[in-house]
Amino acid sequence: MAKIPFNVDAYTARLIGRENVSKLEGAVVELVKNTYDADATYCILYYDEKTDVLYLADNGSGMTEDIIKNHWMTIGRSSKKENFVSQKGRIQTGEKGIGRFALDRIADSCQMLTCTDGGHSRLLWTVDWDSFSNGKNITEIGADLDKTDINFIHFLDGCTNSNVIKLIKKKWKTSGTIFKLTNLRDDWNSELIHTIRENLASLIPYELSAIYKIYCFGNEDTEETAEVFSDLESFSYDYKIEFEVSKQFEVDTKLWRNEYNFGRDEDSILKKAGLIEEKEYFHNTPINKTYKFDEIVPKVSKKEKEALGIFKGIFYFAKKSQTKRDKERFYQKDITGRIDIRDTCGGIKLYRDNFRVRPYGDPKTSAYDWLQLARRKTGSPAGVASKGIWRVNADQMVGSIF
């Protein structure tokens, strides 16, 4: 009996990809995740409004001919399924095998220049996604792959912003990948770019900015204005707590107090309150304490704790309002002009393998207060000056767990 192979209509394969990457913002995030997976330290997203071209560049490890042919060109297949830790020890975060569909979601046409082997091996990959709509089977659709002498700077010929070129020259030395997307499917107006920039700002925790930087360039941006920062970098807060849960289920904590301004009477006030020995803690010195996990979260089984594993986080508490009476009575710092970052930074965010898990902490969604702080506050509404447990509200907290 003859064996006959299955085949798939090219358009059907394209629809499968579109179901995985249906929104533009999600497509951009997926591609940026792939740059992190490639061990990049720099990632650039640049929309050139004069030419209506979108560039995505990373200075990661690049792709060899074998990876392109046997993984990149096989829908649903990815080396990340077997090798889920990169050479630099990063857990692979991109969705396995659907990155190419993110490109399809963004534009009709795509060129990719990728370099490996110290910059000596350069490959140019070109695809027209509309060819998936002409009634052919997937095995009849092809992309062009050629060895080339083109370098990154030549590939960016026609790029309007010279600051992008300068950054590429400075940081793209021996390897990396640049995508050039044309015939874009969306209107890349200022509102869309602002939304994407906000998404990128919350994509990775601030603590990773030392090893991985994202830039979102427009035509007028410099390297300084294009760098995407987490709003937490310059966030004005009253209290900050960092914690880390170890394998032994011990919780190491550091607490910073930033609420008070005692002025010239600081020593007399602290003496009166019996806090003179703790003076340093009111001047950016953290209070260090270690707790047993069961002290903080009782009634958790050993099996549940082991499933949680090691994790850490950082929380910020910030008042949203202040009366003149409270300011004077409690020696509070003046919070006039304090920026509300909830709409951009969100609430308490979850990260897995250093990338956001949505929708937890997303502003203006039901998952913003996934810890149900508001409900706890309603059940115990005592104020600071009242007896009993005082609980914070959801709109007073931002932070990350990762």
Q: Language-model features: where?
A:
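N-terminal assembly/transducer modules of large multi-domain enzymes
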Residues: 145-402
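GHKL (Bergerat-fold) ATPase N-terminal catalytic module, capturing the glycine-rich phosphate-binding loop
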Residues: 1-183, 189-190
